[in-house]
């Protein structure tokens, strides 16, 4: 969706749910190479804060209406909505090691 690999080589990919607490999100994001976060919707502000606290905001993309005909992709730092549509995910890309 973003045109970039999610992971590289031996990177660890973690799938997270946005319903986790902010602290849990920060802990998980800080200890993985790449992540996909589901259940973004009403949890967007908490997820955004966790990504910022984990210092990963430059790696984050939001995909609205994932896998649908009206899908859109945007860097999370450029996303201005306070709530994401139901079929949204956040992708945190890993880096080559």
Identify the residue ranges that each predicted region occupies.
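A contiguous loop/helix-start segment that scaffolds small-molecule binding in enzyme catalytic cores
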Residues: 31-97
């Amino acid at each position: 969706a973003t045109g970039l690999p999610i992971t590289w080589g031996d990177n660890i990919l973690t799938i997270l749910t946005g319903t986790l607490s902010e602290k849990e999100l920060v802990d998980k994001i800080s200890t993985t190479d790449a992540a996909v976060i589901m259940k973004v919707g009403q949890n967007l502000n908490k997820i955004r804060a966790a990504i910022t606290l984990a210092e990963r905001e430059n790696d984050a993309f939001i995909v609205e209406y994932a896998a649908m005909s009206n899908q859109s992709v945007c860097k999370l730092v450029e996303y201005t909505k306070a709530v994401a549509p139901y079929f949204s995910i956040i992708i945190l890309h890993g880096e080559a090691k």
